[in-house]
Amino acid sequence: MEKIKCTIERITFQNPENGYSVLQTTIKGYREEQTVVGIFHEVTVGAVLTVEGNWHVDKRYGRQFAAEKWTEELPADIIGIEKYLGSGLVKGIGPKMAKLIVKHFGLETFEVIENDADRLLEVPGIGKGRVGKIRDSWEKQKDVKDIMVFLQGHGVSSTYAAKIYKQYGKESIEKVQDNPYCLADDIWGIGFKTADSIAEKLGYEKNDPRRCRSGILYTLGKLSEDGHCYAEREQLVKSAKELLQAEEEPITQALDQMIASKDLMLDDEAIFLPPFYYAEVGVANKLRRLIETPIGKNIFDNGGAVTSDVTQKQGQIEYDDVQLSAIRKAIGSKVMVLTGGPGTGKTTTTLGIIASFETLGQRILLAAPTGRAAKRMSEATGKEAKTIHRLLEFNPAEGYGRNDENPLDGDLLIVDESSMIDIILMNSLLKAVPLSMRLILVGDIDQLPSVGAGNVLRDIIDSGAVPVIRLTRIFRQAQSSRIVTNAHKINQGTFPDISNGRTSDFFFIKEEDPERAAQEIVNIVRNRIPKAYHVSSNDIQVLAPMQRSVVGATNLNIALQEAINPVGDCLSRGGFKYRRGDRVMQIRNNYDKDVFNGDIGMVEHVDTEERTLTVSFDGHSIEYEDSELDELTLAYATTIHKSQGSEYPVVVMPLLMTHFVMLQRNLVYTGITRAKKLCIIVGTTKALAYAIHNMVVLKRNTRLKERLTDKSNKQYE
């Protein structure tokens, strides 16, 4: 292999998933810039690299240096020092401040920061606070760089090196060498495969018990990401064996040890991760106890009279027989489910239930899984609705403030968008519901199930353990909406009306070519809808069936940002640039910041000096450091899965055969029902027909239904 020393001038391409990059560099002895390609996680312009590899000639792109391994050095010239300091690696120094510091100290800049940081006070604009921040950051970077050199050859980016340092401190290298699989357990974003790559290079055997244990946990974790609460023992061993390429005996030995130590829970032949097992057991036990607890006799006896009184007072609201039955059933039940599609009167029925319980002097709590769903519930009822996390008074230090020891205070809890609630969240919610309280779960059972593990609402309905009211009639005011009528047609397996009338709220634009479809979507969002309907682009949401492909959410986000918000100071991470005015989404729960997976906000400030980003989530400003930007993604486009519980004035949805692996009836139904005023599909009738007739929905491995239907009346443990 040949060794070169180069300075990065431009990064012309970088794959955020695997780190493959194309760098334009200057190399001593070459007049023109040279192309260097390889795996370069999180390198910055101005960095000086020593790279080992080989020159070759690419048929399309010409002469390139293909990197096998590399290390980063501190630059030795003025321009390089300035670029390095301004890259964001050193907290407290951005591009402008870097110019001032280097102008003052020249080639001595690094020596000053290293040995006499107080001299930075000589630079105009630098105070004692910033000096302290720079000194601490510089020391941290030295430690992180040692870790980075160690991890670099194992496919771990500098971002994750910083997270590893934050988790383990100066013991990071020792910790990773001792058991690299701890990374998969402790560091968000580092999975089993990265940890396994490190372990292999450290000489771990394929049958090592630590490797088998981590592989089993990874397999169960991946299943939970697909919605499963457990795996059958035989299938788990088979899947782990395929993943690990190890012998079966050490895998079964590791599995038996984990069951014996209660690191995994065995229920017949079903193997659970403990949180999912205890959540299922907790939900089943609490629901059964609620159902078995008697209702106050006076309330039950007055149900019919109260319903009649409420309907007379709400004369402007038309209730049909099923809705009246739902109101009476709510008064006479401890637990009830109210389900129905768009336009069937779930909100009207909920209003009737609220009015009836208020007439009875009952205290009512309203909640929903997400901030947007809670806001919609508040607007529809005129009463305060909270997210489940806020209802339960969650704080990151102590967990849920409301629980079985400190239950909720009220008589009735109504939870909207219940199909979104996974088994873990439902267990936390039910712990806080006292036996004296009534519970009504409202939702559309035909939408996508929860993103998290479980199929809670479906299991409760199918168990027959609680009364279920199904609203099916589309009310007169909703019949004029083709969003509503087409959603119901799709849900019934019928092809929708796609004739594009001028007064319609549902349009289908035919386009077979994915690239032209993407261009058309950008044109629709930027030009056609704002001009025709006088709607801001902020009220338009693009919903894609998947992330990947030309018409996937990732590519559409880049194209839409370029069209809507192309210029301004920015911070970059994961292939995206974030600017003031960008719509962004939180993609993991961050309890410290009180923002949750799926929350959408707007970037209100970008500080390129401090390398921070401020995002407004419903009026709450949250600051992100550069290393935290992987918690965000652009949200001009998002997946239909991520849109659950939200409504948007306008929805634009690509639907082409390039999405075929995701084309299912409930996916398209969920996407269409997110639109309040206008829905536009861009794609092919073939893809739409394929989705409508594809009812093959993956069955989720859960045992909640069986626990609820168990006639033995035993309490699960």
Which positions does each model-derived feature cover?
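Accessory, non-ATPase domains that flank or precede helicase/AAA+ motor cores in DNA-metabolism machines
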Residues: 1-299
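Loop/turn positions that initiate beta-strands
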Residues: 46-48, 581, 598
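ASCE P-loop NTPase motor cores of helicases and related translocases
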Residues: 230, 242, 265-413, 461, ...
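Loop/turn-to-beta-strand initiation segments
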Residues: 363, 409-413, 436-440, 678-679
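Short basic/glycine-enriched coil/helix segment immediately N-terminal to the Walker B
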Residues: 397-411, 422, 430-437, 537, ...
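Walker B catalytic acidic pair
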Residues: 417, 443
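Conserved helicase motor core of P-loop NTPases
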Residues: 445-593, 604
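C-terminal accessory regions
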Residues: 599-717
